[in-house]
From Swiss-Prot:
Organism in which the protein naturally occurs: Staphylococcus aureus (strain MRSA252)
Family per record: Belongs to the peptidase M20A family.
Pfam family, one: Peptidase_M20
Name listed for the protein in its UniProt record: Probable succinyl-diaminopimelate desuccinylase
Cofactor binding note: Binds 2 Zn(2+) or Co(2+) ions per subunit.
Catalyzed chemical reaction(s): N-succinyl-(2S,6S)-2,6-diaminopimelate + H2O = (2S,6S)-2,6-diaminopimelate + succinate
Biological process annotations from GO: diaminopimelate biosynthetic process; lysine biosynthetic process via diaminopimelate
Keywords, ordered alphabetically: Amino-acid biosynthesis, Cobalt, Diaminopimelate biosynthesis, Hydrolase, Lysine biosynthesis, Metal-binding, Zinc
Cofactor(s) for this UniProt protein: Zn(2+); Co(2+)
Amino acid sequence: MTTFSEKEKIQLLADIVELQTENNNEIDVCNYLKDLFDKYDIKSEILKVNEHRANFVAEIGSGSPILALSGHMDVVDAGNQDNWTYPPFQLTEKDDKLYGRGTTDMKGGLMALVIALIELKEQNQLPQGTIRLLATAGEEKEQEGAKLLADKGYLDDVDGLMIAEPTGSGIYYAHKGSMSCKVTATGKAVHSSVPFIGDNAIDTLLEFYNQFKEKYAELKKNDTKHELDVAPMFKSLIGKDISEEDANYASGLTAVCSIINGGKQFNSVPDEASLEFNVRPVPEYDNDFIESFFQNIINNVDSNKLSLDIPSNHRPVTSDKNSKLITTIKDVASSYVDKDDIFVSALVGATDASSFLGDNKDNVDLAIFGPGNPLMAHQIDEYIEKDMYLKYIDIFKEASIQYLKEK
């Protein structure tokens, strides 16, 4: 039994794909969802982050247990739209694929949750407990929306949290964190013909970077035991097992220098230069360790000339890989997809769970699971398979019913 026809389910997704939320303007999706939920007499609210950014919260049922279902409303920039085969902000159905920015990451997953929630309410299928929908702003960058919801206590009483990021047949119980670390060197600018009376900031920065590479290589050499196992994820992505060495490397801490800036013109000694790193913390080497790691190198080089800024700081998240939520999703999904394709793994990326759970993470069943091929995220001509989008609505409904009944 369904409340919406297949055509209506696709149109609902089309409606929010048309709302351009490239790292902003989630308020438009919130207003759309508010009107939709009001139509079905479902209690909901909009919580503003700022004038244009907001979260949306809706709830059905009452009492315990409480299952939170979450998805983010922002999408990444579409880039040069001339490079797209189909308009990025207009849903296009072609060869059983639904094209558009955010179809995979992750308006497809979000709308699947929305439809599941409405149909559960309309069909009076909720056996007991509460389902709380948390649609967030700003996941792609600073997780402002998730932080606001956590600060206001929307996760304090939940028993389970499912985030419908695009995972295909993967079910994730944990993931790495993510940190942006910017190291800035300062010097003294002079004309390049008299460099000896100046102080080249690039030289100081290179000294830092050389020491960083040396210390990082030492750390990775000893980084051999990990709580997180990401090997099943990579096996799914590349279609074969990865070597033990590669699995060990991928499951541990990683740090990449991704941006370098220094100097403004060739005939001036630069007085400022910077390096920016993306670091993926793990339980063994967490965010506090990373900050100390960078600061110790800075102190060793010259703390008067070097400074550290951490504009983005999301912690790794762990949970029980055999939790009731994980096993329930695995059991339900096996009726819709090939059982041999289903796997449970840790994830190398980060999600809103970093901001949602905080100190409460040990008490919450976590599952990251949703429709879409993760390799399609952020791509030109992004699409979600129509059949997968529709199937996951039913998976979400059945898994929610079973989890709340048996938790």
